[in-house]
Amino acid sequence: LRNVEQQCRADALVERAQELIHGQQ
C-alpha cells in the first residue's frame, strides 16, 4: 500500500503549496 503513502505525501505538498499561494496574496 505504498500508493496510499505517496498520496498522503502528495496531499501534504498540495496543502503547503496552497498555503504559500494564499500567503503571497
From Swiss-Prot:
Record-level Gene Ontology MF annotations: rRNA N-glycosylase activity; toxin activity
Lineage of origin: Eukaryota, Viridiplantae, Streptophyta, Embryophyta, Tracheophyta
UniProt subunit comment: Monomer.
Primary enzyme class: hydrolase
GO biological process entries: negative regulation of translation
Additional information: IC(50) of translation-inhibiting activity is of 400 nM.
Keywords recorded for this protein, A-Z: Glycosidase, Hydrolase, Protein synthesis inhibitor, Toxin
Function: Inhibits cell-free translation in a rabbit reticulocyte lysate system.
Keyword Hydrolase belongs to the record: yes
Protein name: Ribosome-inactivating protein charantin
EC number: 3.2.2.22
Reactions accelerated catalytically: Endohydrolysis of the N-glycosidic bond at one specific adenosine on the 28S rRNA
KW Hydrolase (keyword) present: yes
